[in-house]
């Protein structure tokens, strides 16, 4: 069995990019040359690549723009794993930068991942901050979750690409595990 690993680096080009190479998942042995497959959508510091395969397309999702108030998540499809990737013409799929996020309680969104659940719903999980004033967020980066829809082959984060503090969603219900005993003895 083999796998593909996406990572970051400039590999002698002098320009940050996303590299991909084949590897043996059991040994970690690199089985192919490292190839730059993207320089991102144009935002600074493309990093945190994730590769997905859906409906015969490979999707490369990146964090771009740095981790503060310019942070964003971009995505592009390709028919082959090594590109070329054409990024979403509607801009980042997730961001609170510029006019899109003015007044949003959650800022600096990015470094995301997309998953589908057992019910076939799609979700995006992302880092973000809750500012307490201009350029200040005392809780650091937190994790947020939002629903995502696929529209004409593109992932679209609900609420205009903004995370919300509260949202409705059809989450699968887990069985509740009852405690074996509730006779805890404390003597301190």
Q: What spans do the regions from the language model cover?
A:
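Carbohydrate-active catalytic/glycan-binding domains of CAZyme proteins
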Residues: 1-188
